[in-house]
Amino acid sequence: FALDIKNAVEQDGDPAGEKFVMLSNIIKVSAMHRVSDIYGPIRYTKFDDFETTGEYDSQEVAYTAFFAELEDAIVGLKSFEGATQFAPFDMSALGGDIAMWRKYANSLRLRLAMRIVKVNPSLAKIEGEKSFSSDAGLLEATDMYINTGFAHPITVISGSWGDIRMGAEMESILEGFDDGRKEVYFNPSDDPALNGAYKGIRMGIEIEAKGQYLGHSSIGSVIDGETIQWMTISEVWFLRAEAALRNWTGAGDAKTNYEKGVKASFSQHGVGGADVYLTDNTKTPKDFVDALNPANNIAYPGDVKIAYNTAGTNEQQLEQIITQKWIAMFPDGQEAWSEFRRTGYPRIYPVKVNNSGGKIDTDIQIRRINFVQDEVNTNGANVTTAIGYLNGPDNGGTRLWWDIPGSNF
């Protein structure tokens, strides 16, 4: 996959391959911003062939390159709208439609703009407002999926391995909100003692035997065959809602965008009742009760509601937006984790047992992943330089460049 992208990008200068270069750059940014959001510094602008050594960019430099490449693609692909040569090779839900790829790239730019809003609010606003003013438009009719040709990894991990079950936060929020998406996201428990309830597991608990919790809720039909979710219409509406809350030009109305985001998520999963759901101003996430070990019971640390509160503070409104965004992103754990790190929402339970030796804060939890040992062994000098770009040591407690503590406003 990486080799295909590299070969396409190297066609730069060949008029016949120009559109493939720009499309490849969109795919490259789609993949590599996730890598950067895991580790921080990455090999990107100086990447050359597949040699085992190479220089790293700081995350700030990488994001600057992401924005430049997306802008080039969004603008450059306009002249190719209507071209069909890409369609036979497009493994995404966009079907080779160049206009739709421009919308996706523009929506991705909005995601990345919001990601840096705390570390560089002026650049975030500039890039976000470019997304709103661009003639490319944003995703509104088609969710972005990739058809991989192989079983979704979560299907294997949940089913064949039996290593994933519903989380305690999902149980608290979906059950507390009486949210119909739970029936798509998860299967009812098959432990007879649980009477078909939707039951989750708290993070960081000690499990003496894996089989203890196997009867809890497994992944449901949300995992559909061989497709992997890259970006949804609902996410774009929630990005618009936050942008409106931040008074970005062209973002529209926060409440309207929030409600469109919820409705888009319900529609995506074939769940009804969104209109009634959005009027509920009483339900809140429920406290978590571990069906097997009451020592793991814990009260939910907040009282966020569903109906949008236009009279609330910016933080209260943002908590509503991100909580619903977090629900809607499932099962895209990478983006949900990034948004939790950026905003602190939704409110999640602290891990029960912290085995990090003091390196990772129990409450704010893991912030990044260490550089892989093989890279340290084979590219040590450059990894050492990359560690210098971080805000601390190479461990899971160190915040990324865009991960700024404190208020969101």
Residue ranges, per PLM feature:
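Structured, solvent-exposed acidic/aromatic patches
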Residues: 1-274, 311-316
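C-terminal functional modules
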Residues: 266-409
